[in-house]
C-alpha cells in the first residue's frame, strides 16, 4: 500500500470531524488536534467532538428548502456527521434536530476508533511553519494564541460577532394544563410543546424582558459588540418593538390547542387564539429535556429563571442549562481563500467551517467535507476540486472565496457570515415564477451535479464508499 503524506486537522468540531473522516476514509493518516478538555471554551459543555453549542437543530429537513438541500447534498457525498445526525435525530416537525449528547458521543467514538486517525488532546497554539498539509477548523471559538498566529499569518484583522444559546428545561417541569403539544399548521406529528400567551401576559413579559439585567461583556468586547441577525438574543429582539417577538420566534399563527374549541369556528378562533406562543423543541431521545426555541439570551441566570418562568406553563420550570452568549471569530475569507478552501498564499493550508464565514451547522460540515476531500487529493498528488455554484455547497464556498459576490449579496462594506439560502444560487435557464416550484428546480439541478461529482471522486478512489 502506497504511503501518502499525513494531514493535520486543527479542531474537532463539526468541520474538523468531517474533514478528518473524509481524509482517513481516503486511506491517509490524520493527526486531529482538539484542545478540550485540557483547555475549555466559553460555550462548550463537554469534551466530545462536534458538540452543538447553540440549538440542536440543523434546520429544515425538506430538500426544497435551502438548509434541507444542503443536508441532502452532504448525504449524497457520504458525510459522516450528517449520517450521525440522521441516526440520532429527535422529533422536530419538519426540521432535523438531534439528541446532542448521543450525536457528539457517536462521532467521538467513530473518530477515536479509526486506525488512521491519531487524536491529540491539546491546544495547537500556532500554525505549522512547514508545508505540512493542514486544515484549520477551529471554529468561531478559536483560542487566543492560535487566533493571534492566524492574524499574523494573514495580515488581516479578525472579524467577529456575538452568538448566544437558549436555555434547556426538564419536560416534567412543564405545566400541560396550560401548555399543549402541536406542530405549526398540524404538519406532521405534534413535536413541539407550545406555551400560549394572551395579550396581557405578553405585555408583562415584554416589559420585564427589556429591562432585565444582562451579563456583563468584557471591555474589549463592549467596544465592538454586534450580533448575528440570524441568532439575536431574545432581549435584543424585544427592544426592537412590542410586537417584534410576535412576528418572530413567538408568532402564534398556525398553532391551536384543541381544548380551546373548534378551530374552524371563526368566533371561537377570534376569542380564543393566542396573542403569542413560546415553542419548546425536544433535546433528547427520551423527551426529558426541552429547549426554548429562539430564546438565545445574555441575561443573568437569575433573571432568566425569573422572567422565563413568567411564560404560561413554565412557572415551575427546572433549568438544566441557562442561555449564554459568546464571541464568535471568523476570517475575512474572500481576501484569503480560494474556492477549494486553500489559502491563496499557502496551498497546503486549508480553512473550513464557521471560521470561514459560513453560518449554520450543515454549512460548517460542508466546509469540512470539501477541505477534507481536497486535502486528501492534494496528499495523493491529484488536482483539488471546486463545486459548481449551482450546488448549495458550491454557492456557499463561492460566497466565502469571492469578495465581490460577498459584498454584493450582503450589500455591506464588511464581510458578514452567510447561511445557506437560495439567493446564492445562479438563476435557472428557464424562469419559474412559482417560488415552491422554482426551489424544487434548484434542488433537482443541484443534486444532479452532486451525483456527478460523487462518481468523479469514486473514479479517483479518494472517496468513502461506505460509512
UniProtKB/Swiss-Prot annotation:
Compartments where located: Cytoplasm
Question: What's the catalysed reaction?
Answer: uridine(54) in tRNA + (6R)-5,10-methylene-5,6,7,8-tetrahydrofolate + NADH + H(+) = 5-methyluridine(54) in tRNA + (6S)-5,6,7,8-tetrahydrofolate + NAD(+); uridine(54) in tRNA + (6R)-5,10-methylene-5,6,7,8-tetrahydrofolate + NADPH + H(+) = 5-methyluridine(54) in tRNA + (6S)-5,6,7,8-tetrahydrofolate + NADP(+)
| Location (main, coarse) | cytoplasm
Q: Which UniProt keywords apply?
A: Cytoplasm, FAD, Flavoprotein, Methyltransferase, NAD, NADP, Transferase, tRNA processing
Determine if Ribosomal protein is one of this entry's keywords: no
Sequence intervals crossing the membrane: none
A Pfam family cross-referenced in the UniProt record is: GIDA
Q: State its cofactor.
A: FAD
Q: Which GO terms describe its molecular function?
A: flavin adenine dinucleotide binding; tRNA (uracil(54)-C5)-methyltransferase activity, 5,10-methylenetetrahydrofolate-dependent
Any single biological process term in GO: tRNA wobble uridine modification
Which Gene Ontology terms of cellular component type are present? cytosol
- The protein's enzyme class: transferase
The UniProt annotation places FAD binding at: 11-16
InterPro entries for this protein: FAD/NAD-bd_sf, MnmG-rel, MnmG_N, TrmFO
**Per the UniProt record, which EC number(s) apply here?**
2.1.1.74
Q: What does this protein do?
A: Catalyzes the folate-dependent formation of 5-methyl-uridine at position 54 (M-5-U54) in all tRNAs.
Q: Would you identify the family this protein belongs to, as annotated?
A: Belongs to the MnmG family. TrmFO subfamily.
Name-wise, this protein is: Methylenetetrahydrofolate--tRNA-(uracil-5-)-methyltransferase TrmFO
Organism listed in the record: Prochlorococcus marinus (strain NATL1A)
Amino acid at each position: 500500500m502506497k504511503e501518502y503524506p499525513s494531514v493535520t486537522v486543527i479542531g474537532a468540531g463539526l468541520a474538523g470531524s468531517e474533514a478528518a473522516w473524509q481524509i482517513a476514509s481516503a486511506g491517509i493518516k490524520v493527526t486531529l488536534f482538539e484542545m478540550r478538555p485540557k483547555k475549555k471554551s466559553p460555550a462548550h459543555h463537554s469534551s466530545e467532538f462536534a458538540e452543538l453549542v447553540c440549538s440542536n437543530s440543523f434546520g429544515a429537513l425538506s430538500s426544497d428548502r435551502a438548509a434541507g438541500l444542503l443536508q441532502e447534498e452532504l448525504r449524497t457525498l457520504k458525510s459522516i456527521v450528517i449520517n450521525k445526525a440522521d441516526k440520532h435525530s429527535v422529533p422536530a416537525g419538519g426540521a432535523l434536530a438531534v439528541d446532542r449528547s448521543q450525536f457528539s458521543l457517536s462521532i467521538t467514538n467513530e473518530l477515536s476508533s479509526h486506525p488512521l486517525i491519531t487524536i491529540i488532546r491539546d491546544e495547537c497554539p500556532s500554525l505549522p511553519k512547514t508545508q505540512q498539509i493542514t486544515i484549520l477548523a477551529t471554529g468561531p471559538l478559536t483560542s487566543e494564541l492560535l487566533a493571534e498566529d492566524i492574524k499574523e499569518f494573514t495580515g488581516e484583522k479578525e472579524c467577529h460577532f456575538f452568538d448566544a444559546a437558549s436555555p434547556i428545561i426538564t419536560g416534567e417541569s412543564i405545566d400541560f394544563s396550560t401548555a399543549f403539544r402541536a406542530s405549526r399548521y398540524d404538519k406532521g406529528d405534534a413535536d413541539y410543546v407550545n406555551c400560549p400567551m394572551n395579550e396581557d401576559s405578553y405585555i408583562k413579559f415584554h416589559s420585564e424582558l427589556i429591562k432585565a439585567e444582562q451579563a456583563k461583556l468584557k471591555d474589549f468586547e463592549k467596544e465592538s459588540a454586534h450580533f448575528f441577525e440570524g441568532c439575536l438574543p431574545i432581549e435584543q429582539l424585544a427592544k426592537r418593538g412590542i410586537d417584534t417577538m410576535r412576528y418572530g420566534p413567538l408568532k402564534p399563527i398556525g398553532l391551536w390547542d384543541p381544548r380551546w374549541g373548534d378551530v374552524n369556528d371563526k368566533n371561537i378562533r377570534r376569542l380564543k387564539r393566542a396573542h403569542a406562543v413560546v415553542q419548546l423543541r425536544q433535546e433528547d431521545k427520551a423527551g426529558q429535556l426541552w429547549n426554548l426555541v429562539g430564546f438565545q439570551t445574555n441575561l443573568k441566570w437569575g433573571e432568566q429563571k425569573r422572567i422565563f418562568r413568567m411564560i404560561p406553563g413554565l412557572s415551575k420550570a427546572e433549568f438544566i442549562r441557562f442561555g449564554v452568549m459568546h464571541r464568535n471569530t471568523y476570517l475575512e475569507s474572500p481576501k484569503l481563500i480560494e474556492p477549494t478552501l486553500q489559502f491563496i498564499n499557502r496551498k497546503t493550508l486549508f480553512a473550513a467551517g464557521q471560521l470561514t464565514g459560513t453560518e449554520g451547522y450543515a454549512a460548517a460540515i460542508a466546509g469540512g467535507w470539501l477541505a477534507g476531500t481536497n486535502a486528501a487529493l492534494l496528499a495523493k498528488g491529484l488536482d483539488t476540486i471546486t463545486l459548481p455554484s449551482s450546488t448549495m455547497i458550491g454557492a456557499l464556498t463561492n460566497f466565502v472565496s469571492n469578495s465581490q459576490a460577498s459584498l454584493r449579496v450582503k450589500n455591506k462594506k464588511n464581510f458578514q457570515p452567510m447561511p445557506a439560502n437560495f439567493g446564492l444560487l445562479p438563476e435557472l435557464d428557464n424562469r419559474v415564477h412559482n417560488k415552491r416550484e422554482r426551489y424544487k428546480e434548484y434542488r433537482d439541478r443541484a443534486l444532479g451535479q452532486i451525483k456527478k461529482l460523487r462518481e468523479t471522486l469514486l473514479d479517483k478512489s479518494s472517496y468513502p464508499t461506505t460509512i
